[in-house]
Amino acid sequence: MAKGRVAERSQLGAHHTTPVGDGAAGTRGLAAPGSRDHQKEKSWVEAGSARMSLLILVSIFLSAAFVMFLVYKNFPQLSEEERVNMKVPRDMDDAKALGKVLSKYKDTFYVQVLVAYFATYIFLQTFAIPGSIFLSILSGFLYPFPLALFLVCLCSGLGASFCYMLSYLVGRPVVYKYLTEKAVKWSQQVERHREHLINYIIFLRITPFLPNWFINITSPVINVPLKVFFIGTFLGVAPPSFVAIKAGTTLYQLTTAGEAVSWNSIFILMILAVLSILPAIFQKKLKQKFE
């Protein structure tokens, strides 16, 4: 079991160093691997690493929340009812209420509304907080289609990349402790598609095979390059966002987020998913043929 665990961490690209030195602690030497003292030392190190990671994560979250507070304070003066509706939408009713407020101020305070939308979307994506699907729908209600699509793709790409960097900085203990088995399996898939990684990321973003939050937090651990990750995400979220944005043009006719997706749109998404992975398949077949 221990050997399997070591192998899994090796596949995930984990690197561990053991400090060696003199002094009071050095007089008794390092504990032998597998001994009770060694297990205690390992537990202390892991516990300290987890606490430090949590402290850094909380600090970053509070800093981001403060930025969101400043964005909100820079918003125009709102009535009591409007302030109540200025929240991250959890259902379609919340989205409609928020859309009503934003559309009222969008023309007069265009930059403030755009910055608030941009910052909120990235905040949700960075910390894997649910609600971005409703913001995608709202973009179709608030802005022309080309701008809405670019805005959603950019926010998704940046937010996911910030989540990637956050995981790279403090998320490794979480991945190692809770997601090791799944991350190892995905690491094997990534290695299999290493030559066509952008196509593979696009495919994953279009299809529902892996949750977006899982892709975001495990990618740095299994050595997916950030540039490839961003480009694949930016392009991969476009087809699903297209569906959500088009639904936003009829926002007040929707009662649930599920109504934004029709069987026709699902069929189109599946076709686009297949097309995204075809170049990799064809190149692999040609390579095998010539070899």
Swiss-Prot record:
Region VTT domain: start-end pairs: 140-251
A family per Pfam: VTT_dom
Protein name: Transmembrane protein 41B
Family indicated by similarity: Belongs to the TMEM41 family.
Compartment annotation: Endoplasmic reticulum membrane; Endomembrane system; Cytoplasm
Native source species: Homo sapiens (Human)
Record-listed Phosphoserine modification sites: S35
Chief location category: endoplasmic reticulum
Membrane topology: Multi-pass membrane protein
